[in-house]
From Swiss-Prot:
Residues 81-118, 250-275, 290-319 are annotated as: Disordered. Regulatory subunit of phosphoinositide-3-kinase (PI3K), a kinase that phosphorylates PtdIns(4,5)P2 (Phosphatidylinositol 4,5-bisphosphate) to generate phosphatidylinositol 3,4,5-trisphosphate (PIP3). PIP3 plays a key role by recruiting PH domain-containing proteins to the membrane, including AKT1 and PDPK1, activating signaling cascades involved in cell growth, survival, proliferation, motility and morphology. The lineage of its organism: Eukaryota, Metazoa, Chordata, Craniata, Vertebrata. It comes from the Eukaryota. The modification Phosphotyrosine is found at Y460, Y601, Y651. It comes from Bos taurus (Bovine). Residues 109-291 form the Rho-GAP domain. The gene is PIK3R2. The SH2 2 domain is required for interaction with FBXL2 and PTPN13. The record marks R144 as: Arginine finger. This is Phosphatidylinositol 3-kinase regulatory subunit beta.
Amino acid sequence: MAGPEGFQYRALYPFRRERPEDLELLPGDVLVVSRAALQALGVAEGNERCPQSVGWMPGLNERTRQRGDFPGTYVEFLGPVALARPGPRPRGPRPLPARPRDGPPEPGLTLPDLPEQFSPPDVAPPILVKLVEAIERTGLDSYRPEPPAVRTDWSLSDVEQWDAAALSDGVKGFLLALPAPLVTPEAAAEAHRALREAAGPVGPALEPPTLPLHHALTLRFLLQHLGRVAGRAPAPGPAVRALGATFGPLLLRAPPPPSPPPGGAPDGTEPTPDFPALLVEKLLQEHLEEQEVAPPALPPKPPKTKPAPTGLANGGSPPSLQDAEWYWGDISREEVNEKLRDTPDGTFLVRDASSKIQGEYTLTLRKGGNNKLIKVFHRDGHYGFSEPLTFCSVVDLITHYRHESLAQYNAKLDTRLLYPVSKYQQDQIVKEDSVEAVGAQLKVYHQQYQDKSREYDQLYEEYTRTSQELQMKRTAIEAFNETIKIFEEQGQTQEKCSKEYLERFRREGNEKEMQRILLNSERLKSRIAEIHESRTKLEQELRAQASDNREIDKRMNSLKPDLMQLRKIRDQYLVWLTQKGARQKKINEWLGIKNETEDQYSLMEDEDDLPHHEERTWYVGKINRTQAEEMLSGKRDGTFLIRESSQRGCYACSVVVDGDTKHCVIYRTATGFGFAEPYNLYGSLKELVLHYQHASLVQHNDALTVTLAHPVRAPGPGPPPAAR
């Protein structure tokens, strides 16, 4: 067996010593076995990766620094390691213990494997879902990097009483209590290769079959939660790095084994100790980039009046799938997510299946605030969600479940198909009939939106401040507890010694020394009482402030629907004005946006002279976010580029706003290019760029107070003017 001098293994289960030469194991222990020891056992080259087939193995437990034998059925292979170890001592044959997979986990050590905790269509283990839901109800708090305390009770019966810190510790403790890391060593090695080669997103490397299905589902659920945590932070960048540092070691538990090149020789690119943190940081960045679409969906619109279908009893033909308002044909999953965003449970639509197989469709249903994808099967002219297929058409299938609960098909989906997303939506819901009247009403709604936004921002600042103060008070209470413990120990020692000295001075008749000892004892008791009183007062303040903090969070949550609704209404009016030909300068006045000084391009007499007509001045092809930010570094506001997005079939616009680079997705739909419905109206990227050369992006995102003014490769605009 040539190659490395030894190999590392990680314990999956606890093992108690049966013989003096045995090693005791705890889950997560790293064990080192020398190559010479495996050669002495007759292990063939390559079989060291399958410790369960080796049997008893001699090695070193790096946690306890003890040597001994351990069962190969209790460990998993990590990778090669360089070492210089003495050879094995001879030992006789010995039967292996049974692999402890089927029995209940030892309290406080391990949980069942993920496949034993949940199964699709559930998206994650119930314990983790319960903890995450409790955290997001309590208020998204920062995860602390400290390791969690060992938990022996996972019933979570009192989870509603936990504060944010205890809940976040619960999530971390859950990940540590799993019998195997959420990201398996094999998947971590694939992710490391993708991260090292920088050939594209790392996320696909952590999908089945590389990562087991239940692990992949749980990882996706956790990343969605952490994405919301990072998105809630005032500065997402530092929050992503902090979450990576906290959760990287929990998800991988150890760096992955190095992945050798095809030739088999090491290439010097072994994972660094900070790889777990970098991997989680990269996954969160990719998740946030997928969510970087700024504009929310418009509210549901009433369907156009259509003649009612003629009943079969009257000799008419059955309703066609193409005529069904809820059937959208060949649209992407991203478009479906956009149409169902912020809709109530029971909202649904049907599209062609992504498999493109004739007769197969996908029903997307809103349930529990998430989109549930249900496949519609087809065989021999019949349709259904599962065998037996009993419906003669998709229309019959959907009509049935508009009146009957989907719990007949899946107990988790206890809802009917209540609210179809209609493709026959009117384009506007604006009651005014003149541009000036609509503009005046737009100004009112925009002002209301800004007022609510300011109120929300003030509440968020107050919530952040009080959360920090609460953490300081908790730390102070812990300090009080330690101080009380020290003083009480001192009091016990003093009381023990005082009895001896009091008896001695009483015999000697030394009243003065007796009074001094008694006075010191009273002072110490008084001081302990003062500290107890201070701690009690601080605990009362903590409870009161925690209650106020929860009230602030409730007020913030109550403002969110108002903000979303006001923004949707405002967007309706913006679309109406744009389609009626209102000038952007006038729209900016209604929105209270100051029209900036004319730049060199707006002074051009002929719009045909704009550099925007040359795609090479702004289209840069396939580059990533970091490369785009480097190209735009130091450029003036309004400098932009268009690149391919990490989302398949989409593009991304990167633009400088207030000296910082912002990114937003450009969708390509059946109606054209655009940043969101109903703005996907442009026949080409060039048409979109020319429109937003004079139209502000603020109508899509309040933070994008800029136009696409300066193509990044166009001559002329340089760096921003130096500060005076």
